[in-house]
Amino acid sequence: MQFSKMHGLGNDFVVVDGVTQNVFFTPETIRRLANRHCGIGFDQLLIVEAPYDPELDFHYRIFNADGSEVSQCGNGARCFARFVTLKGLTNKKDISVSTQKGNMVLTVKDDNQIRVNMGEPIWEPAKIPFTANKFEKNYILRTDIQTVLCGAVSMGNPHCVVQVDDIQTANVEQLGPLLESHERFPERVNAGFMQIINKEHIKLRVYERGAGETQACGSGACAAVAVGIMQGLLNNNVQVDLPGGSLMIEWNGVGHPLYMTGEATHIYDGFITL
């Protein structure tokens, strides 16, 4: 099997062309490949498939390092666009793809940046999914070590966002896994820890569902900005600094799609026997 190793701000991926080669992965195979000592090593495995809908260009599948399939990965989407362009699978600047939860448009810009239309943030608790009677801008979550206020939103995958005073000292290691597996998120959740620098600049760390804390989480950056805007804390264009680098997020509010812009880097190509 041919593959490419890529990263978006240090969030690393193995990307596989499932259009020109037949590929099938069991969860056990994915876990073995994800092992950084005995396999290739990655946060997520991305598979490019032929479109399920003839109106679209590709279908986009995402698997976490633990073998679980998920519906969205923003950093992965940028790498997906870079991959299909590099491999000559398309020459379009605007690439339309489907995911488990909907469609996306990925735009390859002239400055080497990728702009992703992430769709509209989803706030209805049942659709996140999150257990709550109605939408609120802040929810109280109780864990074994502390009670937190958080925003909850789906960007095609579930996110909870907690505001912290200092990103460096935030208790991500302990609180992250407790939020990820919190009973009010039946499909688990990506936990974001956001420090607001000003209305157009935040710092963020994300404990990702099925992957742990990563260098960057694109959908997590989108979720944090969406929550901050809904809570009246942020403007419509925000720079998000993650451990691996920065993203620009734009959102004009309810009824509008949210856009993420950032880099996608090709590291190397390889061949492995499964």
Swiss-Prot record:
Residue runs in coiled coils: none
Keywords, ordered alphabetically: Amino-acid biosynthesis, Cytoplasm, Isomerase, Lysine biosynthesis
Biological process terms in GO annotation: lysine biosynthetic process via diaminopimelate
Binding-site residues for substrate, renumbered to this chain: 11, 44, 64, 74-75, 157, 190, 208-209, 218-219
Primary site of residence: cytoplasm
Known EC number: 5.1.1.7
Function: Catalyzes the stereoinversion of LL-2,6-diaminopimelate (L,L-DAP) to meso-diaminopimelate (meso-DAP), a precursor of L-lysine and an essential component of the bacterial peptidoglycan. Only accepts DAP isomers with the L configuration.
More details: DapF utilizes a two-base mechanism involving a pair of cysteine residues (Cys-73 and Cys-217).
This protein's name: Diaminopimelate epimerase
